[in-house]
């Protein structure tokens, strides 16, 4: 029986942060079973070279490398090089880009290294990734390192449990909040009532969530009830250590290799400077904290000037536990561990709803007095204290109302009857994104919602980009034959705008409410400037996606020729996930033309974060920096939000496109992208 990696580490000296460059181009990895014990939880885990995580692979940009993987398991395996731009046949997804590695067989991956930065590898077979088949990748730049540091550490954040993935899935299919032991209760009602401004608002909040068969406290599907959160596979009671000397510059390469957990990372008393996101350099951003989604990577630099220990604190998003480490000038020296923040509580914003105009009696399963929810009453709703304040860059109730955003000549009050607009027919409106089955033409549509300088969303429209406002509408469903844009009051088009026909739009419209889709976000908003649930009022500088600006412009300056709109959907009660209301088994491939420039727009109809990963390509997140939009391989889609990214389909083949919460992917939130 092999000795557990954590047992080996317990007697080893802490790493000193000096990683010699590698000249190795031929690698051999063995996948097999190793008995691993972490925090008293023992598992006969699938491992690479008998360790969790697997060995660090260090490459150099411009080289061609060869990696032979031998499978000693009794089942198929594979390795995917997460974030690396490789040929499709080397991407490592069985059944899609290759046949997988059968028991007793080997496969040699061979590909050129076209990039540099921090990445990782993991299995794409049989949920082996959830049990430890992971490892880090560092790629040195072909040119001299632009951010030289005295020390360099890899920090892999993860979870550990001895409960099998199959059992976890079975439990959540039986009861979606099976691992949520922090439900609201009768005992918590007085405190909630005090927070919400009275018993009635608190009860209304609970009734709304009950009517939707959802829980406002269900933040993470799987929690610290069974997970031990780890840092480099070391439990918090031991904690990872890294040495330093005062005054040194230290590079920390954070990789979220977890199965289901988003982490909020900080080092109390020490400023971090973000220098790279998903391996790509960004303009330096000084921060106190950042949220890292599953599969994301961030490189930060710290420079401690005091000769004492600093705690690396990575709390789970649901605040049921944390991973722990220490930067220390001497072995065994520790710093205080900060308390965890209060647990986040979801609001109707996370459901993509217009909170001012909600009529609770019309919600499924609700029978309430005729008392509409107004903006004045929203101040008493649960967790509104967690909403950003007016001087922040995030959405407030005032900014969501946005009376100053009304278009000249257009009455935008929420009693507006769209049926009176020329050419607007009942058939046309019913097919517009955001319209619900049975919604009449004269029903309230709500106000325009502010998103970002480049994103304005009108209820009933998908308009993530002002320069192609009409492109997000289902133009075929509208009778426009006798109507020009110039005829619409207050909608004179700038002469520099491209004609609406310049952008081909693939928009399926909102998915139906059925067994596979529990909710439609009628008012999705841009949340790129929002640090995430639970982080808005911490008095700490928290990284947001709007802070990320690439150091170099996009290599492809072309505008997109096509926009593909995808809804992220699911049914929490049945634990089913998908795109556009369909599971993977019910969906065909997304077909792209070779070298096509495409915009993907994601509308999150669920109350959960989804880290979305497109294999094989950079996703250029449209966060307002134009040519300097950051290039990422994994992007968090926040609940009730809309966002978009550009990509260039410059590599032919079949590619995976999925949520990187493993159980969401396994239960349907997976698509294929075909480039030919």
Residue ranges of predicted features:
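Histidine-centered copper-binding motifs that mark active-site loops
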Residues: 2-294, 301, 331-448, 454-459, ...
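Short, acidic/polar linear motifs in exposed loop/turn regions
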Residues: 73, 258-259, 306, 606-608
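A short beta-strand micro-motif common to beta-rich folds, especially ectodomain repeats
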Residues: 121-124, 309-316, 655-660
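Short acidic/polar inter-strand loop motif in beta-rich domains
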Residues: 127-133, 309, 316-324, 663-668
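Intrinsically disordered, low-complexity acidic Ser/Thr-rich regulatory segments
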Residues: 204-232, 472-549
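A conserved active-site cap/scaffold subdomain adjacent to cofactor or substrate pockets
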Residues: 255, 299-311
């Amino acid at each position: 029986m092999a000795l557990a990696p954590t047992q080996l580490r317990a007697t080893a000296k802490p790493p000193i942060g000096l990683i010699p460059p590698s000249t190795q181009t031929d690698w051999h990895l063995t996948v097999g079973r190793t008995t691993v014990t972490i925090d008293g939880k023992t598992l006969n885990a699938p491992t690479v070279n008998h360790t969790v995580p697997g060995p660090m692979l260090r490459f150099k940009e411009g080289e061609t490398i060869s990696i032979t993987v031998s499978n000693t398991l009794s089942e198929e395996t594979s390795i995917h090089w997460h974030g690396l731009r490789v040929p499709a046949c080397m991407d490592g997804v069985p059944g899609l880009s290759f046949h997988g590695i059968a028991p007793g067989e080997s496969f040699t991956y061979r590909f050129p290294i076209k990039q540099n930065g921090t990445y990782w590898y993991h299995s794409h077979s049989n949920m082996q990734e959830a049990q430890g088949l992971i490892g880090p990748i560092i790629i040195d730049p072909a040119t001299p390192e632009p951010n030289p540091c005295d020390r360099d550490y890899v920090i892999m954040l993860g979870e550990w449990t001895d409960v099998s993935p199959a059992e976890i899935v079975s439990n959540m299919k039986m009861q979606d909040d099976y691992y949520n032991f922090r439900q609201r209760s009768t005992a918590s009602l007085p405190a909630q009532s005090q927070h919400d401004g009275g018993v009635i608002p608190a009860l209304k909040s609970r009734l709304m969530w009950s009517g939707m068969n959802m829980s406002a406290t269900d933040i993470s599907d799987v929690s610290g009830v069974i997970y031990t959160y780890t840092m480099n596979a070391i439990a918090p009671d031991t904690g990872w250590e890294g040495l330093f000397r005062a005054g040194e510059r230290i590079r920390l390469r954070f990789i979220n290799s977890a199965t289901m957990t988003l982490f909020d990372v900080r080092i109390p008393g020490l400023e971090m400077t973000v220098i790279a996101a998903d391996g790509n350099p960004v303009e330096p951003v000084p921060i106190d904290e950042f949220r890292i989604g599953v599969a994301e990577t961030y490189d930060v630099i710290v420079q401690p000037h005091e000769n004492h220990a600093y705690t690396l604190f990575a709390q789970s998003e649901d605040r049921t536990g944390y991973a722990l480490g220490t930067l220390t000038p001497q072995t065994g020296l520790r710093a205080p561990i900060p308390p965890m923040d209060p647990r986040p509580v979801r609001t109707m914003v996370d459901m993509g709803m217009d909170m001012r105009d909600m009529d609770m009696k019309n919600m499924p399963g609700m029978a309430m007095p005729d008392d509409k929810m107004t903006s004045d009453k929203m101040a008493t709703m649960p967790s509104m204290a967690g909403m950003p304040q007016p001087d922040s860059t995030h959405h407030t109730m005032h900014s969501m109302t946005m009376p100053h955003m009304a278009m000249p000549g257009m009455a935008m009050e929420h009693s507006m009857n769209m049926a009176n607009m020329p050419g607007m027919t009942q058939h046309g409106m019913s097919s517009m994104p955001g319209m619900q089955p049975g919604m009449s033409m004269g029903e309230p549509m709500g106000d325009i919602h502010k998103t970002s300088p480049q994103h304005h969303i009108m209820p009933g429209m998908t308009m993530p980009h002002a320069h192609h406002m009409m492109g997000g509408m289902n133009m075929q469903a509208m009778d426009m034959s006798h109507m020009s844009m110039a005829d619409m009051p207050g909608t004179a088009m700038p002469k520099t705008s491209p004609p609406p026909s310049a952008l081909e739009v693939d928009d399926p419209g909102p998915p139906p409410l059925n067994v596979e889709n529990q909710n439609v976000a009628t008012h999705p908003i841009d949340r790129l400037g929002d640090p995430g649930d639970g982080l808005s009022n911490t008095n700490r500088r928290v990284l947001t996606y709007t802070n990320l600006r690439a150091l170099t412009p996009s290599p492809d300056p072309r505008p997109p020729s096509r926009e593909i709109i995808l809804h992220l959907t699911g049914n929490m009660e049945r634990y089913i996930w998908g795109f556009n209301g369909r599971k993977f088994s019910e969906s065909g491939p997304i077909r792209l033309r070779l070298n096509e420039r495409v915009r993907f727009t994601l509308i999150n109809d669920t109350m959960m974060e989804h880290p979305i990963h497109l294999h094989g390509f950079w996703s250029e997140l449209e966060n307002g920096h134009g040519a300097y939009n950051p290039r990422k391989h994994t992007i968090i889609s926040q609940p009730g939000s809309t966002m978009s990214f550009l990509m260039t389909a410059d590599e032919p083949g079949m590619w995976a496109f999925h949520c990187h919460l493993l159980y969401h992917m396994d239960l349907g939130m997976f698509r294929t992208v075909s480039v030919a």
